[in-house]
Amino acid sequence: MKRVGAHVSIAGGVENAPLNAQKIGAKAFAMFTRNQRQWHSAPLSTASIEAFRRNCEEAGFLPQHILPHDSYLINLGAPEVEKLEKSRKAFTTEMQRAEALGLTMLNFHPGSHLNLVSENECLATIAESVNLSLNATAGVTAVIENTAGQGSNLGWRFEHLARIIELVEDKSRVGVCLDTCHLFASGYDLRTPEAFDATLAEFDRVVGLSYLRGMHLNDAKQKLGSRVDRHACIGEGMIGREAFVHLMQHPAMEEIPLILETPNSESWAEEIEMLYSFEKE
């Protein structure tokens, strides 16, 4: 089964996320486990944790279909010691929050070198950050998201992802989430079935399809290789409808979270319905 969903709100408490996902006909969802614009958050209450688990169970969401995302403030490759320590502490806390909620994954953007250190040094720092958090937790997989390659962000080449994975000690607890907009923006074409398959084959060659834990489904507002991260609604951007029809029929997309982050949350229910209709074309 294809597990399409969206990145839903946790307003009023994390326990509302599965309810919000259910309302839009989702079969998977993403969420933040706290306010992602702040460094510090109050610990999750026992009541919230229990309500979250109960709501997930009642709505039929299994842990492997839920892909929480860490705060955008975190930079696990930060060249400055103070920012790096702050990021590592925050990331470990988020891994622990995911663990407390009974979840098995945490999605994160790799990090940025800020033009202060080399790419290789930054990738090694990111991997060491992941190792520290994995050692401080149990059962939660760190899921690296590919990036569009804006600024000094790393993770826009498959080789970056492969290098981080190579340096992570526990390979059973590291994975990848591929964002279609980020792929396209960083130069990986998806527009035709042939282009889509070639990109997936390249990912398999460099990283390995066995590491694929989820997808973010977004069309792109900018052209191929623009290195600009601007999401568009499905079928309304430069990637186009055909890519998403092929994705919804692709066997590699079975039973992993396929998460919409398109600009208009009001249309997510319609986009989910549309994506499911693509399976039948």
Swiss-Prot record:
Protein name as annotated: Probable endonuclease 4
InterPro entries xrefs: AP_endonuc_2, AP_endonuc_F2_Zn_BS, Xyl_isomerase-like_sf, Xyl_isomerase-like_TIM-brl
Catalytic activity: Endonucleolytic cleavage to 5'-phosphooligonucleotide end-products
EC class (word): hydrolase
Residues annotated as binding Zn(2+) 2: 145, 179, 216, 261
Pfam short name (any one): AP_endonuc_2
Positions that bind Zn(2+) 1: 69, 109, 145
Keyword Nucleus listed: no
Organism: Chlorobaculum parvum (strain DSM 263 / NCIMB 8327)
Protein keywords: DNA damage, DNA repair, Endonuclease, Hydrolase, Metal-binding, Nuclease, Zinc
Cofactor remark: Binds 3 Zn(2+) ions.
Record EC number: 3.1.21.2
HAMAP family: Nfo (MF_00152)
